[in-house]
């Protein structure tokens, strides 16, 4: 059984390793797509790696590195979201890391759904090594080794650059005719001190740009999964995290750890509306529609002291502090023609400001005996924005009873809070000159979980969990409607709400089962499944399905490695995924025409579903191990059966001037996608 890194974690915690992200079909070396194999966790759609944890919005998921919550670590990220089409995080520089899906320890605040606690591994401090790889998603290079022959200090550096243009010329369909450009990097210097203590200097970041020019597509090109099919869009993002982590043992029973870093993120875009001649596809005009530029710079510190009081008691005390400068600007046309004059535009966002957030915590672990272990903790969250942005006491509790050497029961309780995406506070509604949501408060979630695990064999484990989550303080519109922020966060669209209040509620409950055969004797297998329900009640008082209530999800993965000659290994892996279809409602054609995007009627919203989701993936690798070098080629065949899984509706007016259902197009997720790579290690 694989234990998580955090000793305070009792329940709803999983460790994932580099080995798993390499072997699992369809994971693409991405921590988020890897986590979607866990019970209770599923991807939002094929074009992005947002994850839905126990029916919650992806907005409730955070990423942490060295105790610091980092910005969205994905290329082409939307402000406030947690996912994107392609991860900046690369499994080659990550060490074994933890993922939490509920009632997480008290050191993890400002999250109501899930937490990635990621570790950047140290470089090899004995010899210099090099890894090079080229494939569909980029050409990448990694080098690591000792900094000096006279110490155990090491370095690790990695860089990746996009190669999609070359593969698009070969006819590979990525869901868009545009060519995304991106690059990312990671670096770490690990510096142990002779008299004890360690300093690590690390950084990671990425830059991305795409121009989706629908106007230049032919009529036969079809829809674009990454853009609106009535607009030309230019979109760019970047993020950078750079920090220093210091650890030092104070004595044999205690140590301190402190991380200080700066986080920088930017998203910018401009859109032009396409007006086509209904009788001639190639006859069109472009009218400026909107442009925005969002910037944030955050300075963070995470510090803690860990003390083993005696054989039975361990105490951890610490805090996370963040100071943020931000600048949000966005203007949009005020008329359908969108003439390029100053008086035809209005600000949707126009705010320069700063904020401070502080999260102190304490965690305690007590061993009543080898059979019974308790963890308990308290945390608090304070944000200096809004009238209800202080959560003074959030208790966390975990209890584990080891029935025998093979089986155990676990129990967890947690009270969690989370701030809203920062930009949502500063939206300026049409007809107003001031933002009207600056006093948004926190969202709260109470978790209760009961689990059972059985180590059937040394390489085979069974785990089941049942859970219930009660959510309050969800932002909903003050005017009665079906809108709730709990349905946001899984796509490329930002939120432009009316006046909001924290009066929405919701709940999630479910049953999860995992049966895992760990890699041994050259093969592994995993089955994970969940049955769940996810509901919310907005300001109109009508209980509805959340947009993420698919009701069920199941995964089966298996893989085996074969020795096919001296120093040669053939690897085969399969993955089968089934899940409930995406929620939908009845489209309002008139409102959609007014807004230029799909608008659903409040009546019957999310009552119906698209057809259920199915995907079959196969991964094949061939590795040649030589004395000083290793070669590996691989191909991941995603959606091998070309299953037509429905993504959503989009607004695509046919030009006849009549607002009706003919203006609404049905979009499908990615079809068959072959992902090839070649890798060399020496």
Identify the function of each model-found stretch:
Residues 468-470, 492-582:
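Gram-negative outer-membrane beta-barrel transporters
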Residues 228-249, 353, 417-471, 488-518, ...:
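Outer-membrane beta-barrel signature, preferentially recognizing the C-terminal barrel domain
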Residues 2-104, 115, 121:
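Periplasmic N-terminal accessory/gating domains of Gram-negative outer-membrane beta-barrel systems
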Residues 198-249, 264-295:
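Flexible loop and strand-edge segments within Gram-negative outer membrane beta-barrel domains
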Residues 135-161, 174-213, 234-258, 262, ...:
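Transmembrane beta-barrel wall of Gram-negative outer-membrane proteins
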Residues 74, 215-220, 406-448, 468-494, ...:
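Surface-exposed extracellular loop regions of Gram-negative outer-membrane beta-barrel proteins
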Residues 472, 525, 577-596, 613-615, ...:
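C-terminal beta-signal and adjacent terminal beta-strands/loops
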Residues 289-290, 294, 298-302, 348-353, ...:
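Outer membrane beta-barrel strand-and-loop segments of large Gram-negative receptors
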């Amino acid at each position: 059984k694989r234990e998580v890194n955090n000793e305070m974690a009792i329940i709803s915690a999983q460790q994932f390793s580099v080995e798993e992200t390499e072997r699992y079909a369809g994971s693409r070396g991405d921590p988020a797509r890897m986590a979607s194999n866990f019970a209770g966790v599923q991807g939002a759609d094929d074009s992005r790696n947002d994850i839905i944890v126990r029916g919650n919005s992806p907005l409730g998921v955070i990423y942490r590195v060295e105790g610091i919550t980092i910005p969205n670590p994905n290329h082409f990220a939307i402000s406030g979201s947690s996912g994107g089409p392609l991860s900046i995080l690369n499994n080659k520089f990550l060490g074994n890391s933890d993922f939490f899906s509920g009632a997480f320890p008290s050191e993890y605040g400002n999250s109501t759904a899930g937490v990635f606690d990621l570790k950047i591994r140290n470089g090899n401090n004995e010899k210099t090594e090099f890894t090079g790889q080229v494939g569909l998603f980029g050409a990448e290079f990694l080098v690591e080794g000792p900094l000096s022959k006279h110490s155990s200090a090491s370095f690790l550096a990695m860089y990746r650059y996009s190669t999609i243009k070359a593969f698009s010329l070969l006819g590979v369909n990525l869901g868009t005719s545009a060519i995304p450009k991106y690059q990312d990097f990671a670096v770490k210097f690990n510096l142990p001190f002779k008299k004890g203590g360690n300093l690590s200097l690390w950084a990671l970041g990425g830059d991305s740009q795409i121009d989706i020019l629908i106007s230049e597509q032919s009529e036969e090109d079809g829809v674009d999964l990454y853009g609106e099919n009535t607009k030309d869009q230019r979109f760019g993002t970047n993020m950078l995290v750079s920090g220093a982590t210091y650890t030092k043992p104070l004595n044999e029973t205690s140590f301190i750890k402190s991380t200080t870093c700066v986080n920088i993120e930017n998203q910018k875009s401009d859109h032009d509306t396409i007006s086509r001649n209904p009788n001639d596809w190639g006859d069109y005009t472009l009218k400026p529609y909107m442009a925005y530029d969002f910037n944030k710079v955050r300075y963070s510190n995470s510090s803690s002291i860990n003390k083993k009081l005696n054989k039975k008691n361990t105490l951890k005390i610490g805090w996370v502090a963040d100071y943020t400068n931000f600048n949000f600007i966005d203007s949009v046309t005020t008329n359908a023609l969108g003439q390029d004059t100053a008086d035809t535009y209005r600000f949707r966002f126009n705010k320069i400001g700063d904020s401070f957030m502080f999260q102190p915590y304490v965690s305690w672990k007590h061993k009543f005996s080898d059979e019974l272990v308790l963890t308990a903790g308290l945390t608090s969250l304070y944000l200096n924005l809004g009238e209800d942005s202080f959560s003074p006491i959030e208790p966390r509790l975990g209890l584990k009873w080891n029935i025998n050497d093979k089986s155990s029961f676990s129990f967890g309780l947690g009270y969690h809070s989370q701030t809203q995406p920062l930009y949502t506070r500063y939206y300026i509604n049409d007809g107003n000159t001031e933002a009207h949501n600056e006093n948004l408060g926190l969202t709260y979630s109470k978790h209760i979980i009961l689990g059972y695990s059985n180590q059937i064999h040394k390489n085979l484990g069974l785990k089941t969990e049942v859970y219930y989550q009660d959510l309050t303080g969800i932002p909903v519109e003050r005017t009665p409607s079906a809108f709730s922020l709990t349905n946001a966060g899984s796509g490329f669209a930002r939120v432009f709400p009316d006046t909001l209040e924290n009066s929405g509620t919701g709940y999630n409950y479910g049953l999860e089962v995992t049966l895992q055969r760990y890699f041994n004797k050259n093969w592994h297998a995993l089955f994970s499944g969940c049955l769940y329900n996810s509901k919310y009640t907005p300001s109109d008082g009508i209980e509805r399905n959340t947009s993420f209530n698919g009701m069920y999800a199941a995964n089966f993965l298996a893989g085996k490695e074969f020795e096919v000659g001296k120093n040669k290994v053939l690897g085969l892996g399969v993955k089968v995924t089934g899940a409930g279809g995406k929620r939908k409602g009845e489209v309002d054609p008139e409102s959609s025409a007014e807004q230029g995007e799909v608008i659903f009627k409040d009546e019957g919203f999310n009552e119906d579903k698209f057809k259920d989701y199915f995907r079959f993936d196969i991964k094949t690798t061939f590795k040649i191990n030589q004395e000083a070098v290793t070669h590996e080629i691989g191909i991941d065949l995603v959606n091998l059966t070309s299953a037509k899984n429905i993504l959503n509706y989009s607004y695509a007016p046919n030009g006849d001037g009549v607002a009706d259902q003919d203006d609404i197009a049905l979009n499908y997720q990615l079809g068959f996608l072959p992902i090839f790579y070649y890798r060399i290690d020496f």
